[in-house]
UniProtKB/Swiss-Prot annotation:
It comes from the Bacteria. Belongs to the cytidylate kinase family. Type 1 subfamily. The keyword Nucleotide-binding applies. InterPro entries: Cytidylate_kin, Cytidylate_kinase_dom, P-loop_NTPase. Its EC number is 2.7.4.25. It comes from Salmonella arizonae (strain ATCC BAA-731 / CDC346-86 / RSK2980). HAMAP family: Cytidyl_kinase_type1. ATP binds at residues 12-20. This is Cytidylate kinase. It catalyses: CMP + ATP = CDP + ADP; dCMP + ATP = dCDP + ADP. It is an enzyme of class 2 (transferase).
């Protein structure tokens, strides 16, 4: 009987550093990587492209069911491919981020994408980045981490990222958007943003990314007894 590939789930709010942590862990362990948030962003982008209403669950479900998405790691960067097109940059806009949070609130949309996410579980293992990886998608994962940070710190990180790309941003507006999104994600009826009961809660507010990676890898290796 073939053993089920192990999964390390990394959940947490937007801007906590999940993406950077997951890439580092996947590289260190040489495991596969799933950015579940990207799947919802790809669906949101497809909906925007095809003029499908973000408030119409009936219209979104068939779009989600036939969504052709895959991840390709190239030179340490994760490329998100939608129907053969690299949409890695396009899905990272604030418009798409807000739209993704909206479509993720629908139960049948989540069900349509659930099987696709679980299909990423292959040997030697999977690093799963998301908001409900440890509570819904991979509840049997042997290692679960909930990465958090204050809303102010996350808004500041996002502002710096946007400024580096040449965008002019207002901190207070960005903070308000993050708080609104947090409230929506944490209070939705289906798969709210909460740590799994058996997850390690790691607050990155006052930690460098190197410290976060070190703590997460140490915890994962202890749980998995990896050398």
């Amino acid at each position: 009987m073939t053993a089920i590939a192990p999964v390390i789930t990394i959940d947490g709010p937007s801007g906590a550093g999940k993406g950077t942590l997951c890439k580092a862990m996947a590289e260190a362990l040489q495991w596969h990587l799933l950015d579940s948030g990207a799947i919802y962003r790809v669906l949101a982008l497809a909906a925007l492209h095809h003029h499908v209403g973000l408030a119409s669950e009936d219209a979104l479900v068939p779009l989600a069911s036939h969504l052709d998405v895959r991840f390709v790691s190239t030179d340490g960067n994760l490329e998100v491919i939608l129907e053969g097109e690299d949409v890695s940059g396009e899905i990272r806009t604030q418009e798409v981020a807000n739209a993704a949070s909206q479509v993720a609130a629908f139960p049948r949309v989540r069900e349509a994408l659930l099987r696709r996410q679980r299909a990423f579980r292959e040997a030697p293992g999977l690093i799963a980045d998301g908001r409900d990886m440890g509570t819904v998608v991979f509840p049997d994962a042997p290692v679960k981490i909930f990465l958090d940070a204050s809303s102010e710190e996350r808004a500041n990180r996002r502002m710096l990222q946007l400024q580096e790309k040449g965008f002019s941003v207002n901190f207070e507006r960005l903070l308000a958007e993050i708080k609104e999104r947090d409230d929506r994600d944490r209070n939705r009826a289906v798969a709210p943003l909460v740590p799994a009961a058996d997850a390690l809660v790691l607050d990155s507010t006052r930690l460098s990314i190197e410290q976060v990676i070190e703590k997460a890898l140490q915890y994962a290796r202890q749980k998995l007894a990896l050398a």
